[in-house]
From Swiss-Prot:
Annotated S-S bridges: none
Entry's family note: Belongs to the CcmE/CycJ family.
Described function: Heme chaperone required for the biogenesis of c-type cytochromes. Transiently binds heme delivered by CcmC and transfers the heme to apo-cytochromes in a process facilitated by CcmF and CcmH.
Annotated positions binding heme: 128, 132
Gene Ontology process terms (BP): cytochrome complex assembly
Keywords recorded for this protein, A-Z: Cell inner membrane, Cell membrane, Cytochrome c-type biogenesis, Heme, Iron, Membrane, Metal-binding, Signal-anchor, Transmembrane, Transmembrane helix
PANTHER family: CYTOCHROME C-TYPE BIOGENESIS PROTEIN CCME HOMOLOG, MITOCHONDRIAL
The encoding gene: ccmE
Region (Disordered): 142-164
Name this polypeptide is given: Cytochrome c-type biogenesis protein CcmE
InterPro entries: CcmE, CcmE-like_sf, NA-bd_OB-fold
């Protein structure tokens, strides 16, 4: 092999190494911003045989379990349970919930898995249209009935106000 050919091969090798390194660094950087979508059943039982890791960022979608919303009177902290067709997952969130958030309504939350079955959400999005649902969630939630707000039971308060 002549010196000129060796020099070309070395240049091609260096360029190839730099391209592979750049792609590797981009994938590593993107890994922190990827949020995988899960349903409550997939968080508890695993998705394709793999459960999400504690501390992993993810998106979860499901229906808010009626009667599960608990608000802290001292702060904006709220916790609620999400369900699809199986087990429930508890979501905690500190902030102002969307206007369309209510029990029996579909939501998508973005956050971190803090424990098996527990999510600390940084963002909560409520479904805008009664008919729309993300395709991943729609597939998992076939057979769950949507609870309309006007059909939600209300309970008597201590001052006698209330209906139904």
């Amino acid at each position: 092999m002549n010196p000129r050919r060796k020099q070309r091969l070395a240049v091609v090798g260096i360029i190839g190494f730099l391209i592979v390194s750049a792609v590797g660094l981009m994938l590593y950087a993107l890994n922190d911003s990827i949020d995988l979508f899960y349903t409550p059943s997939e968080i508890i039982e695993g998705k394709n045989g793999q459960k999400p890791q504690i501390g992993q960022r993810l998106r979860i979608g499901g229906m808010v379990v009626p009667g599960s919303v608990s608000r802290d009177s001292e702060s904006l902290a709220v916790s609620f349970d999400l369900i699809d067709t199986g087990p429930t997952v508890t979501v905690t969130y500190t902030g102002i919930l969307p206007d369309l958030f209510r029990e029996g309504q579909g939501i998508v939350a973005t956050g971190v898995l803090t424990d098996v079955g527990a999510i600390k959400a940084q963002e909560v999005l409520a479904k805008h249209d009664e008919e729309y649902m993300p395709p991943e969630l729609a597939e998992k939630m076939k057979g769950i009935k949507h609870v309309k707000p006007e059909n939600m039971p209300t309970y008597e308060s201590s001052n006698g106000a209330g209906s139904k």
